[in-house]
Amino acid sequence: MAGGAWGRLACYLEFLKKEELKEFQLLLANKAHSRSSSGETPAQPEKTSGMEVASYLVAQYGEQRAWDLALHTWEQMGLRSLCAQAQEGAGHSPSFPYSPSEPHLGSPSQPTSTAVLMPWIHELPAGCTQGSERRVLRQLPDTSGRRWREISASLLYQALPSSPDHESPSQESPNAPTSTAVLGSWGSPPQPSLAPREQEAPGTQWPLDETSGIYYTEIREREREKSEKGRPPWAAVVGTPPQAHTSLQPHHHPWEPSVRESLCSTWPWKNEDFNQKFTQLLLLQRPHPRSQDPLVKRSWPDYVEENRGHLIEIRDLFGPGLDTQEPRIVILQGAAGIGKSTLARQVKEAWGRGQLYGDRFQHVFYFSCRELAQSKVVSLAELIGKDGTATPAPIRQILSRPERLLFILDGVDEPGWVLQEPSSELCLHWSQPQPADALLGSLLGKTILPEASFLITARTTALQNLIPSLEQARWVEVLGFSESSRKEYFYRYFTDERQAIRAFRLVKSNKELWALCLVPWVSWLACTCLMQQMKRKEKLTLTSKTTTTLCLHYLAQALQAQPLGPQLRDLCSLAAEGIWQKKTLFSPDDLRKHGLDGAIISTFLKMGILQEHPIPLSYSFIHLCFQEFFAAMSYVLEDEKGRGKHSNCIIDLEKTLEAYGIHGLFGASTTRFLLGLLSDEGEREMENIFHCRLSQGRNLMQWVPSLQLLLQPHSLESLHCLYETRNKTFLTQVMAHFEEMGMCVETDMELLVCTFCIKFSRHVKKLQLIEGRQHRSTWSPTMVVLFRWVPVTDAYWQILFSVLKVTRNLKELDLSGNSLSHSAVKSLCKTLRRPRCLLETLRLAGCGLTAEDCKDLAFGLRANQTLTELDLSFNVLTDAGAKHLCQRLRQPSCKLQRLQLVSCGLTSDCCQDLASVLSASPSLKELDLQQNNLDDVGVRLLCEGLRHPACKLIRLGLDQTTLSDEMRQELRALEQEKPQLLIFSRRKPSVMTPTEGLDTGEMSNSTSSLKRQRLGSERAASHVAQANLKLLDVSKIFPIAEIAEESSPEVVPVELLCVPSPASQGDLHTKPLGTDDDFWGPTGPVATEVVDKEKNLYRVHFPVAGSYRWPNTGLCFVMREAVTVEIEFCVWDQFLGEINPQHSWMVAGPLLDIKAEPGAVEAVHLPHFVALQGGHVDTSLFQMAHFKEEGMLLEKPARVELHHIVLENPSFSPLGVLLKMIHNALRFIPVTSVVLLYHRVHPEEVTFHLYLIPSDCSIRKAIDDLEMKFQFVRIHKPPPLTPLYMGCRYTVSGSGSGMLEILPKELELCYRSPGEDQLFSEFYVGHLGSGIRLQVKDKKDETLVWEALVKPGDLMPATTLIPPARIAVPSPLDAPQLLHFVDQYREQLIARVTSVEVVLDKLHGQVLSQEQYERVLAENTRPSQMRKLFSLSQSWDRKCKDGLYQALKETHPHLIMELWEKGSKKGLLPLSS
């Protein structure tokens, strides 16, 4: 340990005489023996030199505590003069990099290489001889620092043959370095290459050959150059000299003996040695944490751009973003062991050296939340005052400029806090003592020091549940090591070049382990195991393919010749108790309670399993992952006592579910370890370690039913757990349960896990891997979506392509947006030639392909007989590439039907070859050549091919804006000659560049993804189109439906024509339309008859075949023929007794009794209220319950959609949606809910009723009817902000001058049948004034879930408003039947109008009243707003609809023009009057 207390201590001990040094060691040994009951190893006397004694003391107690013990011992020895001089020297030595001296108020100056360790030479005691000085000088470093490390390493290793010699990181970091390489050099960061073939992410360096020794020499040379430039030498592995890393056992952590250190950890590698082993991590800045939707969704291109992440350097964490604003809160989020805590501490240390944020922050404070949780009450002033690095300035002065303060909160999610929003209970002043969580809640809630900045580390992405005030935070995900960083890590860990090469080669040859090593903690674990084998001169072997087996290997090596089975069981029990109690620090009493005494504790400390924290004395596992690993072993080892009839796996499941909750269950390392330990290999290793036979009751296959209930098909964490088992039989059974999958994959490790598990699924049809395309509002059925921010290396492309060889059901592969090397393309083409590869669609848009790649693709297509669609858009293929493809496409055996070559750098030179394909290919039906410079010459050549009698093409994509008028006329003539041919153009030029790779392939699908995105999750027509695909002509249902598939209004490059208003055309009129209770179908609204209001019985006659939707209920029918249907809304109460057992099912929707002619209904879409948006609920758990005379029968639905359950060819009886549950999981099911607000005006006051219910139309209707009886009127307000949870309690509050008491103040979200009394809150307002603000919050964490402003205008019925110029009035009953323009294109307008608010503003006061305007705005999506607007328009006359048409024309001219143009082609509308 170069410098700091170690250097000073070594200097003064070297000055002691031999007899004094011996006495010094004996006194220390006596002190240590007096504490041996606490598990400390007694100090060992008879060290031969002061240097050795200093090394031992620092290794055993930590720098600061070793220094304090030395001072105290010198006083006992009577060396008061030496003690005083040492204290004085320490107090005036700010140059020590890690001494407890105070930094200056300004940015710390950067030390030069000659000053790193020199100051303590001048602190030698008076009378120090020249010889002794020379003896010290011999140990000083040269400019590179290498000689110092060599000497200190040698001394430390010789002095401690039996002591631990490996320091370990905190809960988030391995012993080896894991932080970002920005601290290595503060010049400009390395610029990423723009070449599309780059195999590494920005910032990775030195792709050198490890076999030549150049790589190793290059690293050492770079370290020397840094030192020569004036930077301190950078780092050995976690603080111990490199040569000391010859044992498996790491040290416990010595901590400095100050109160500050009991709260804010200072770790033992806090020195130059650690920094020199620094290895770069990948940091990905995101607009939102992974798996969370953005707050505001805009059009699809903007939406994609908003959610695209980018790699970021640590120096830019607090830099301005695209909005030029600098963030105040930065959140470092990542998996366990990924390096977050190390990175956080490095920020503090780099700032202290003047290398980071010196111009931004004057003070930086690091707080470990693990330690902070131990404090009962503390004020911010006390916390800062106890920070050993704080300046001597008064606290008031430090806090006078909060904008210059940075608080680092490490592991904020570890203690299980809920850091509430500001309230009266939170502290408002920095001097006020508070519980630690309240203090942090006040800081983050901005009730104190609102201008301060924060750097927060956490595992979970659900921090907004813990800290509700994080809306403006900058999210940065720590992805781990890149390919080259992993390699560099190995070369820095092993200081011997030959050892480094051997270890690196061995691990890289194990592809699974090499992928797992992107997690720094796993890299450290692998290196440590190999180092131990080298030390023992054993043959190097490391066959682990999972993290579980690697941990078992580590433990087995540490336990050689040390049978500690019973003691290990006690340690496992301690770990499990900590997991249940969210506890990571254990007192000596905690250990004794589990049978762990001083000697055993000392053994575990030396083995590197536990670490000690001296003041106050406590212990923790060396890493939180180790605690989770031992906790998992505790579950497996637990005996059968007290288990009763429950299976072991159920007990294990209940314990982990209790500890982590259903949302965190599969993301927890404990669950992964548990499944890994239950695998065959895991059981064998555990039996060898514990020398026992494990219980036969713990069979991995027993987990299958429970996992099928709990596993989330869109959860990568679930696949991580399955991967740990690597059991084919187990995986086949579990994966067969998945019917559709969708997930986000961003690293080699995640890709490995995903592709491994997919091999065992029989239902996955589509595999999509697109860079930067994280969020989608809809998922295609049976689809896996893979997203990456770092280019996949060739080795892992091969792993991915191996899936195609074994998964015969995979039909579609989308790799758009990923940079493919030439080697990767060759691997893919070899796969395409395999007979077992049955791909039908391949999308490679924006993959950086070249003409040479086209040659390989043509070769791959030669043997493939199944591929029908190929998308190569946005690649610079050039004419040469197109010619290679044409050679294959001309062959009669080629089955390709669709080829997309958008923006591929093509010119007229390749058009002759393309024309020959058009005239020769028997299968090609669609060719997209947009955004290529074909000009008139090239297009004329294409026309010759199109006129050939053998041409089968029916769709041709061309940009016509660059063509001459003569050429355009020729194309129109060609379309007349060939009626089946459609020449389309739907992309704006320059929308995308060849490297962007947006969803070009899906844009041209018969049902485009662009269209699906705009339709959104609530558009019923999307369900209709799917349901009618086989038997119905969609164009008959929605006459203009295919227009949306042909073009997009925002990208049509045509001039706007002057289209007259439909009001001026005498043949356009309206027909009588229905009310909100009507169905909507192919012919418009269909009236619904109320047969029996008391029984909620309705009758409707569907006049023709087609799809019909009931907006008020969400119910949908797909009819084969005209038929009359009766619908009765029932109550569940009378049938619940037939559900056995009751607790295993949850009611998830209304109960309906439908009567219809058998066979007349093709499909029915029944609404449900389970929130599926986040992918937290397994859709296979849904069942349709039929109640017949013989009892309840369950039917598996044909499919589960976002808001509906679909039954095909249904048989009818009372039926409703149920969700299968497990014990105690009800509170984890997200529910779509609504807040119903009613009011009644009295002379003196206004009475309000507020309901919080699941979104069930039958319950809502029952409440409406009840409130109407008491003359209450509903006020329409938006639904809750997020899904809520059954059984949770929510508080209702309000603010306003006339607001009276709310009774009750709490509501529980629960399901009560429509016939039961529903829970509601009642309150009175005496004087409404300008309005009252109502809020509903989660009682547990005070999270705001609903908010609304009630204004006086809300209380006035619409009929009382003064009608404006053209307020909507009913249409005359004798109006002709031809639909108005806005009615004819109703579904198109609902799906594609994006600027709804602008349209509403134009209608406000002219067509819409204030109440109607707010009702429309209250809907939560644009399609819902448009649908509500159209429900109001049903009673409008022609002038009102003309007003809507005019507003739409002004807001969306391209859309209106397109609808007119397409309608005129079909004879539906004239182009002019």
Curated annotation (Swiss-Prot):
Annotated site residues ((Microbial infection) Cleavage) in this chain: Q130, G131, Q333, G334
Activity regulation: NLRP1 inflammasome is activated by cleavage by the Protease 3C from various human enteroviruses and rhinoviruses (EV68, EV71, Coxsackievirus B3, HRV-14 and HRV-16): cleavage promotes ubiquitination and degradation of the N-terminal part, releasing the cleaved C-terminal part of the protein (NACHT, LRR and PYD domains-containing protein 1, C-terminus), which polymerizes and forms the NLRP1 inflammasome. Activated double-stranded RNA: positive-strand RNA viruses such as Semliki forest virus and long dsRNA activate the NLRP1 inflammasome. (Microbial infection) The NLRP1 inflammasome is activated by human herpes virus 8/HHV-8 protein ORF45, which interacts with the N-terminal part of NLRP1 and promotes its translocation into the nucleus, relieving autoinhibition and leading to activation.
Enzyme class name: hydrolase
Effect seen on changing R726W: In AIADK; uncertain significance
Segments carrying motif ZAKalpha motif 2: 177-183
Recorded consequence of changing R1392E: Impaired ability to induce programmed cell death
Catalytic activity, as annotated: ATP + H2O = ADP + phosphate + H(+)
GO molecular function, one term: pattern recognition receptor activity
Domain (NACHT) ranges: 328-637
Tissue expression: Widely expressed. Abundantly expressed in primary immune cells (isoform 1 and isoform 2), including in neutrophils, monocytes/macrophages, dendritic cells (mostly Langerhans cells), and B- and T-lymphocytes (at protein level). Strongly expressed in epithelial cells lining the glandular epithelium, such as that of the gastrointestinal tract (stomach, small intestine, colon), the respiratory tract (trachea and bronchi), and the endometrial and endocervical glands, gallbladder, prostate, and breast (at protein level).
Residue list for modification Phosphoserine: S93, S99, S101, S107, S113, S132, S163, S168, S170, S173, S179
All residue ranges annotated as the FIIND domain in the record: 1079-1364
LRR repeats: 809-830, 838-858, 866-887, 895-915, 923-944, 950-973
Effect on the protein of changing Q158A: No effect on cleavage by HRV-14 Protease 3C
Documented effect of changing E1322R: Abolished ability to form the NLRP1 inflammasome
Record's GO cellular component terms: cytoplasm; cytosol; NLRP1 inflammasome complex; NLRP3 inflammasome complex; nucleolus; nucleoplasm; nucleus
E.C. number: 3.4.-.-, 3.6.4.-
Biased composition (Basic and acidic residues): 218-231
Amino acid composition bias (Polar residues), ranges on this chain: 170-182
Protein's name in the database: NACHT, LRR and PYD domains-containing protein 1
